[in-house]
Swiss-Prot record:
Citrullinated by PADI4. Ufmylated by UFL1. This is Large ribosomal subunit protein uL16. Belongs to the universal ribosomal protein uL16 family. It comes from Pongo abelii (Sumatran orangutan). InterPro entries: Ribosomal_uL16 (IPR047873), Ribosomal_uL16_CS_euk_arc (IPR018255), Ribosomal_uL16_dom (IPR016180), Ribosomal_uL16_euk_arch (IPR001197), Ribosomal_uL16_sf (IPR036920). GO terms for cellular component: cytosolic large ribosomal subunit. Gene3D superfamilies: 3.30.60.300, Ribosomal protein L10e/L16. Component of the large ribosomal subunit. Plays a role in the formation of actively translating ribosomes. May play a role in the embryonic brain development. Component of the large ribosomal subunit. Mature ribosomes consist of a small (40S) and a large (60S) subunit. The 40S subunit contains about 33 different proteins and 1 molecule of RNA (18S). The 60S subunit contains about 49 different proteins and 3 molecules of RNA (28S, 5.8S and 5S). One of its GO terms (molecular function) is translation regulator activity. It comes from the Eukaryota. GO terms for biological process: embryonic brain development; regulation of translation; translation. The gene is RPL10. It is found in: Cytoplasm. There is a cross-link at residue 175 (Glycyl lysine isopeptide (Lys-Gly) (interchain with G-Cter in SUMO2)).
Length: 214
């Protein structure tokens, strides 16, 4: 018996049901890699960031997330080179879906009990996504804006429902606006730290502030 189509599990009807000591024997999620491309690129190398944003409250299967990841990665490698971008899948499939297997052979009515004891066995995992939640993000150089939009557009076809493509006003994967970012780094209010930044607040010991600005 094959996998049941994901359209059967598209809507968020039940409460979140994660893997636990009570919910055992869950098959591994299809998606294993959530970051692709040049993920160790410094924060100042990739200022542009594009998001794919969900427009529906639904469930996305781990198979769909994997298919979208492969699709976006393949296009970005072809158009920007394998070191010209960083893709991050922002959803993790933690919700376990169940199946109550039914026999379809002759004489099945003697072997099975129909809807008696119908709590199913774990079949796979899905990610629950809300309206306005980011599904996937890509950061790259400013000249690759059109390629980011096209990669996310192609990845959209792997998902049910509606999604929007949004070019962020923030710098890369940080939460700081792109037009203020370089000034804040120059003033040492932001310290680059891998693909993110550390924010140094105005509070704290004066000696620490003097040491930073000396």
């Amino acid at each position: 018996m094959g996998r049941r189509p994901a359209r059967c599990y598209r809507y968020c009807k039940n409460k979140p049901y994660p893997k636990s000591r009570f919910c055992r024997g869950v098959p591994d999620a299809k998606i294993r890699i959530f970051d692709l491309g040049r993920k160790k690129a410094k924060v100042d190398e990739f200022p542009l960031c594009g998001h794919m944003v969900s427009d529906e409250y639904e469930q996305l299967s781990s198979e769909a997330l994997e298919a979208a990841r492969i699709c976006a990665n393949k296009y970005m490698v072809k158009s920007c080179g394998k070191d010209g971008f960083h893709i991050r899948v922002r959803l993790h499939p933690f919700h376990v879906i169940r199946i109550n297997k039914m026999l379809s052979c002759a004489g099945a009515d003697r072997l099975q009990t129909g809807m008696r004891g119908a709590f199913g066995k774990p079949q796979g995992t899905v990610a629950r996504v809300h309206i306005g939640q980011v599904i996937m993000s890509i950061r790259t150089k400013l000249q690759n804006k059109e390629h980011v939009i096209e990669a996310l557009r192609r990845a959209k076809f792997k998902f049910p429902g509606r999604q929007k493509i949004h070019i962020s006003k923030k710098w890369g994967f940080t939460k700081f606006n792109a037009d203020e970012f370089e000034d804040m780094v120059a003033e040492k209010r932001l310290i680059p730290d891998g693909c993110g930044v550390k924010y140094t607040p105005n509070r704290g010991p004066l000696d620490k502030w003097r040491a930073l600005h000396s």
